[in-house]
């Protein structure tokens, strides 16, 4: 599936709609911010999607994706850094996940260099799961 679209396999519990952060019906819950910065010596565009601050609790609950922060290389629009925050809590599922992905160029190839994950989820009738890991990717053999 792709974050920001409704191209997901299942739509149980309205999750399909909740992942479509650019859908016209979901836009009322989010701020969309474009800026730029220098990140690791690369000029980057910064695109942030985050839940609006002035929402009521019931409105915030409509937004499974609480934040997506992306740094795009200005030269080719490759993602150099991406951060996700997911929060959802209802009678069927409770989840809270943070994912951060670092990407860079190795031998001219765009590759992930580090992935951080810190998450919790509990689905009705299943054991709750908690994971926290830091995956460092290195020694790429680019041919």
Q: Where are the model-predicted features located?
A:
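Extended lipid/amphipathic-ligand handling interfaces
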Residues: 67, 98-107
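Membrane-proximal, glycine/serine-rich, low-complexity loop/turn segments characteristic
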Residues: 89-94, 106-109, 114
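Flexible domain-boundary/linker segments
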Residues: 57-59, 94, 99
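Structured extracytoplasmic
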Residues: 1-64, 88-90, 120-143
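Long, charged/polar, surface-exposed segments that mediate recognition or autoinhibition
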Residues: 65-68, 72-86
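Extended beta-sheet lipid-handling architectures
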Residues: 49, 81, 96-98, 112-118, ...
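Short, hydrophobic/aromatic-rich segments at coil-to-beta transitions
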Residues: 40-48, 78-83, 109-114
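Hydrophobic alpha-helical segments, especially N-terminal targeting/anchoring helices
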Residues: 37, 72-73, 104
